[in-house]
Amino acid sequence: LIQDGHVDGKNIHIFEGMKILGGSNDGAGSIKDGFVCRGGRMLNEETYENFWELFDRIPSLDHPGQSVTKEILDFDHLHPTEARARLIDRHGKILDVKSMGFDNNDRLTLGKLMITPESKLDDITIEQWFKDAPHFFTTNFWYMWQTTFAFQKWSSVFELKRYMNRMIFEFPRIETLAGVTRTPYNQFESVILPIKKYLDSHHVNFVTNATVTDIDFKDDDTITVKALYLNKDGKDEKIILNDNDICIMTNACMTDSATLGDYKTPAPKPVEKPISGELWYKVAQKKPNLGNPEPFFGNIKETNWESITVTFKGNKFLKIIEEFSTNIPGSGALMTFKDS
């Protein structure tokens, strides 16, 4: 908007329901209290063209005169990823994963998926697609692809196809994750903070702890927004949009319903409904062709997942992992205990 659309930054307003910016990239904390990273993005040099083009325009916070893109790629090239303990069995043995483990039926079923139009894949799970090829779920490929991109058997085969198309470069190197592009720090500090500072310098208005609770549309066949309903710090507010205003909505977030536990207490079941999901339900009822949030928010057991961020005061654990995997810290990407 600022660079290509020449929009004055002071006319851009970003409403965030949380107290911190970054969405799923909100890794934050302190040495004293520990860190929490609710999510992370697996970057890839070959296929994230829009990301690299954008951040090639954003200055690095640590290296004056250098872009965030160059900072990340330089760091990654100096610290390449090469997992040496990608899959581990129930006996603690590192498995040989040079072979994908496919049989011919697996190959045919996967190949058929790649050439099937997306219009024929609605409401089909991965398990349903491979119902006549159950061996697929015992292959090294499934265990590695599943844990790299957070798939389950009940996930959408539509999404699996899209990941296969988009991440096809990772197919021949999935056993080492050599294609994973690492950021120097966690992605909140390496990605969110630089772009936040850049937008601040252009006087973009960030409003945190502000939940958009509903949207009014024009009474025609467009999806033109005429009003936003906001709850800011517990107070309701209505914002009227002008005819030439642009409204961009985030209709869902993977970490929207996240709750936190601690060393002694499990994360509790969410009490509040997901803010982006609730908004999506409302707008989908008002206008056609805005998607269906039910599969994403109506199947709690299937869409629930747990993530643990560990903050150590020493390096003993890192040394144990390094000795076991032969990877120095940061170079091994993922270790999957396939029978856990």
Enumerate the language-model features and the residues they cover:
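Glycine-rich FAD pyrophosphate-binding loop
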Residues: 2-30
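Extended hydrophobic secondary-structure segments that form protein cores and membrane-embedded regions
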Residues: 11-19, 71-74, 247-249
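Short catalytic/ligand-binding loop motif for oxyanion handling, primarily in non-cytosolic enzymes
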Residues: 22-24, 81, 216-217, 255-259
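Conserved FAD-binding subdomain of flavin-dependent enzymes
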Residues: 32-74
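Amphipathic alpha-helical segments that form well-ordered structural scaffolds
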Residues: 50-57, 144, 190-201
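Rossmann-like flavin
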Residues: 61-166
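Helical element adjacent to the flavin cofactor pocket in flavoenzyme catalytic cores
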Residues: 165-246, 251, 270, 277
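Glycine-rich loop(s) and the adjacent beta-strand/alpha-helix scaffold that form part
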Residues: 231-330
